[in-house]
Amino acid sequence: MSPKKIFFTKGVGRHKERLASFEAALRDAGIEKFNLVYVSSIFPPNCRIISKEEGLKFINPGEIVYCVMARQETDEHNRLIASSIGVAIPADENQYGYLSEHHSHGETDEKAGEYAEDLAASMLATTLGIEFDENMGWDEREQVYK
């Protein structure tokens, strides 16, 4: 069983109870109707990214849906938190790529996103035998993958 399509979504939930907050985030993301099963971070070969709207047409309420999820929570008022999924897809569609989850405190969503992308890219680089200098800027590293 290997997915041929994937979509990304995001959500934010606020409530005094953590479970209710998580449910609100799932609703905000549009995936509250599904039984989510977490999987690790492999982007399948020959898989394509589709819109959330298109992806939701393929799944029904109560269905088991496999997902890579980044989740962060806090009970501290005004605490800055972020979570993000990074994706690294090889040029050769027949090879697998990586999805990385990142969860942080005190970091903006933009910084969390950059970190998750870098993490996914570094995991992919190791499988392709590409030297990956973590101290190099993203724009420079991105050229290695093109």
Model segments located where?
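Helix-coil modules at protein/domain termini and other flexible surface or pore-lining loops
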Residues: M1-K146
